[in-house]
Regions:
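Short beta-strand-to-coil "C-cap" segments at the C-terminal boundary of structured domains/repeats
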Residues: 3, 130-132
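A short acidic/small-residue loop/turn micro-motif
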Residues: 7, 134-137
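Amphipathic alpha-helical segments typified by the pilin-like N-terminal helix
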Residues: 1-35
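Extracellular/periplasmic head regions of type IV pilus-like filament subunits
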Residues: 26-116, 121-124, 131
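Short amphipathic beta-strand/extended segments with alternating polar/hydrophobic composition
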Residues: 1, 120-121, 137
């Protein structure tokens, strides 16, 4: 029986990749909940909008640590970009009319040399991966 062993740097890269995909899925889930329950079918146009508390006192849609459009976490740089803003009403958490978006994109780029995969997702909910930077969709 042969036992294969990952080099520590590759094992770390896999752990970072797994974390990055998890964060992207969390953003998709937060956006889906925000659009359905708070924003009348529109998406948050910033990560800060997802961390704002609704007027009813319930929790925000994302943890406050994700309150910037560019964050560094688990070996990745995450960049959030809103799509076009629409004729949106005010949201349940204080986003002003016309400030919510019709689409969004968030990409994850490895910060470290041992990171090999880039990830991205948008309002469609699919997480894409590539060996090079994924263009905003």
């Amino acid at each position: 029986m042969t036992v294969s062993r990952l080099e520590p740097s590759r094992a770390r890269a896999i752990a970072f990749e797994t974390s990055a995909v998890g964060i992207l899925r969390t953003v998709n889930s937060a956006q889906a909940t925000f659009t359905a329950s708070c924003a009348s079918g529109f998406y948050a146009s910033s990560m800060l909008d997802l961390t704002r508390l609704p007027a009813d006192g319930s929790d925000g849609y994302m943890s406050p640590e994700f309150n910037l459009n560019t964050i560094y976490k688990s070996g990745y740089r995450f960049r959030f970009r809103p799509g076009l803003r629409g004729a949106s009403p005010a949201t349940c958490n204080g986003v002003q009319p016309g400030r919510s978006a019709t689409t969004y994109y968030i990409g994850a780029e490895p910060e470290l040399a041992d990171g090999r995969r880039f990830f991205g997702t948008n309002q469609g909910g699919t997480v894409y991966q590539s060996s090079s930077r994924i263009q905003d969709t």
